[in-house]
Amino acid sequence: RTDCYGNVNRIDTTGASCKTAKPEGLSYCGVSASKKIAERDLQAMDRYKTIIKKVGEKLCVEPAVIAGIISRESHAGKVLKNGWGDRGNGFGLMQVDKRSHKPQGTWNGEVHITQGTTILINFIKTIQKKFPSWTKDQQLKGGISAYNAGAGNVRSYARMDIGTTHDDYANDVVARAQYYKQHGY
């Protein structure tokens, strides 16, 4: 089972903002931009597919969601230097922030992906408590947003991404995850 926290295909999304799409060299924004970026990352992502699926099954999170976060955070490792990104604070494929967590494992290994996914699950659980009337799928989206900007930043369903990087984090990750789900994740 990988659907304990909702199903990414049931989540509405506006996709990438122009602030996210433009630096990628795209002249368009939205879901199609997210899917294009995810497609560009697919070859690199496929190197980690087995581990991503194993962790997803172990922790009952859709592997596609993990892949969506990895694409957004590190372009499947392509932008990292010795496993580090984000001015030396973010570690690994999932960019675990060393200011909030002690990074575990190698930057691209199972231990790291397990740590990042566990951090995501903890945010989903916090959002479940904060917004008990939301559907499971809405809570999943809220947890994805919180992975970027913290649970305190999630104030309403419609505006959860305001305050995330480029104000589009969960919407972009969800659209990328939908792409990865179509590609066997």
Curated annotation (Swiss-Prot):
It comes from the Eukaryota. Pfam families: SLT (PF01464). PANTHER family: LYSOZYME G FAMILY MEMBER, LYSOZYME G-RELATED. The active site is at E73, D86. GO terms for molecular function: lysozyme activity. Its main location: secreted. Keywords: Antimicrobial, Bacteriolytic enzyme, Disulfide bond, Glycosidase, Hydrolase, Secreted. Transmembrane segments: none annotated. It catalyses: Hydrolysis of (1->4)-beta-linkages between N-acetylmuramic acid and N-acetyl-D-glucosamine residues in a peptidoglycan and between N-acetyl-D-glucosamine residues in chitodextrins. Shows preference for N-acetylmuramic acid residues that are substituted with a peptide moiety. It acts only as a glycanohydrolase. This is Lysozyme g. One of its GO terms (biological process) is peptidoglycan catabolic process. It is an enzyme of class 3 (hydrolase). Its EC number is 3.2.1.17. Disulfide bonds join C4-C60, C18-C29. GO terms for cellular component: extracellular region. It is found in: Secreted. It comes from Anser anser anser. Belongs to the glycosyl hydrolase 23 family.
